[in-house]
């Protein structure tokens, strides 16, 4: 899977841009605030229809413009498809090969990406919401059905919470049954993904850190026992809701379910967020991304595109070297941003292009 051409119009601070990326490494360099990350963000949006920086489409449109256009020509197995995303204050519209796409199923899989940004290290010590967001995005990248289940659960949860706030009992049990059914599917999908990722995570942590520390990743259901979730998830979820029923009525919100669950990152048998150094946390998150890359390749039989934001800020020389070795060994298209080319030894890589970014201009 490769992006052969990219066209951007009125996106963020970027001026009208046309790129013909290299098949392997593409390096965008320049001072902070010039628009480097915006280029990676545009690729991510073309792949997922979401930004990794904002939830509002209006934030993505260049100041003074009424809309933005993103286009990417993606080659896979000898077939090239044109992906076009239109952005305005009403939201996003998608076209594939100039045909409107209304169902996410018809869009899924045309462009697979893995992104690593400096902010993602924050999820180690941050709120559970950050780790859930990471996990949901990763599961969706590999499972076309997950997003529709997630949206269905969110709608049911909203209705159930509304009934709790109003103290209405008439249809409450029906909404609880629906919540359990969709919640079960989310938990099972998350568990399956983590099970598939676990051995890859261990392998790549050794590669990136250069040591034999033991890492693991574990799902932490809220008000549920993990062993029960691996048995009958629906029963475990229903029991958790029954246990929290009195407190739910008092607080007017649903207190158990995948919207409250967490993911625990583990180092040498202990929580990484409490006992891991900053370097260990960086290595762990990067190993997660490497594992995700390998998993997508195995699932789709095609290498995803790797987006690496701000190489200079998050990695020391040893981790940087190990990451570059990982990327060089794969027939993978890579887009990297950095403040200086001195952060990357371009003499050691093949098939690359460099671009200087200055005030929204892409200079070759």
UniProtKB/Swiss-Prot annotation:
Entry's Gene Ontology cellular component terms:
cytoplasm
Keyword terms, alphabetized: ATP-binding, Cytoplasm, DNA damage, DNA repair, DNA replication, DNA-binding, Nucleotide-binding, SOS response
Gene3D superfamilies from the UniProt entry: P-loop containing nucleotide triphosphate hydrolases, RecF/RecN/SMC, N-terminal domain
Example GO biological process:
SOS response
Output the Gene Ontology terms for molecular function.
Answer: ATP binding; single-stranded DNA binding
Which InterPro entries does the entry link to?
DNA-binding_RecF, DNA-binding_RecF_CS, P-loop_NTPase, RecF/RecN/SMC_N, RecF_2
Cellular localization per UniProt: Cytoplasm
Q: Which domain of life is it from?
A: Bacteria
Cite the binding residues for ATP.
30-37
Q: What is its main location?
A: cytoplasm
Q: Does the keyword Cytoplasm apply?
A: yes
Its biological function? The RecF protein is involved in DNA metabolism; it is required for DNA replication and normal SOS inducibility. RecF binds preferentially to single-stranded, linear DNA. It also seems to bind ATP.
Q: Which family does it belong to?
A: Belongs to the RecF family.
Its name, as the record gives it, is DNA replication and repair protein RecF
Can you name the source organism?
A: Geotalea daltonii (strain DSM 22248 / JCM 15807 / FRC-32) (Geobacter daltonii)
Gene behind this chain?
Answer: recF
